[in-house]
Amino acid sequence: LTQFNLDRVRGIDLPPVKHFWFTSRKGRSIHNMLVLPPGFDASKKYPLFVVIHGGPHTMFRDQWFLRWNYHLLAAPGYVVLLTNYSGSTGFGEAAAQTIQGDPLRTAGEEINEAADVALRDNPFIDGSRQCAGGASYGGHLANWLQATTTRYRCLISHAGLVNLESQWGTSDTVYGREVNNGGPVWEQGPVWREQNPIRYAAQFKTPTLVTIGEQDFRVPLNNSLEYWTVLQRQQVPSRLVVFPDENHWILKGENSRLFYAEIHGWLARWLEVPAK
């Protein structure tokens, strides 16, 4: 069974993944990977797609993955950047706990820093064409980038929260949210006030693709509807795609094909790369 698709994989151009580290402004050692597109030519310029992992207590590693397949995302002609931001697992318990009390701000800064390092060290990346996106906690962070930077031409948010307060009241992760946010919502501590993306809605400007499974109980549909409504209200170019028969993950074959088609179409539109 481990060799079932080996012959098919042999016929696919899968460039080696490039690993790199940098020291963040806060002195933390951050691990990253660059995934290159098939037919990569270092003399050419490629747009950058910053992909943000969920969790937050998981990590990017060199693996074959269905939901966010790195090589499939890179295939139309993108360099894909994967960053194990603060809170990622695999680097010790203390490192994983750094996100408690600071769920979005530092991780968002590290993602931007990683993009800066990638641009500095890889002249084949076109810094004028960058997009960021992720699912679940990666969607949360994509929404935080919406609130805090305009460096990206577009954003992609799958199952991402935009409102910490409504997420607390509808998700199945009440306790974990309180741990990361420093207490229950009614205490209105600094995180609830300062790291809630919707509080910065007046600043939303970046075109965004919002996708969600209608049966999602981890990050329920209401947060995606809230986000899309705000984007429409602010006249930010945006698209909402709801999968009625999917939960937190987009797993069914035809739905997965549509999911990737939507992502590639959005990237092609804003990063000026022909869709494939």
Identify what each model region corresponds to.
Residues 40-46, 51-92:
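Short substrate-entry loop that stabilizes the transition state in hydrolases
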Residues 31-33, 79, 209:
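Residues embedded in well-ordered beta-strands
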Residues 35, 51-52, 133, 211:
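Short hydrophobic segments within beta-strands
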Residues 69, 74-75, 82-276:
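Active-site-proximal cap/loop segments of hydrolase catalytic domains
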Residues 17, 29, 45-46, 127, ...:
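A structure-centric signal for secondary-structure junctions around beta-strands
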Residues 6-7, 28, 55-58, 124, ...:
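Active-site/binding-pocket entry motifs
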Residues 1-44, 61, 68, 75, ...:
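Non-catalytic accessory segments flanking enzyme active sites
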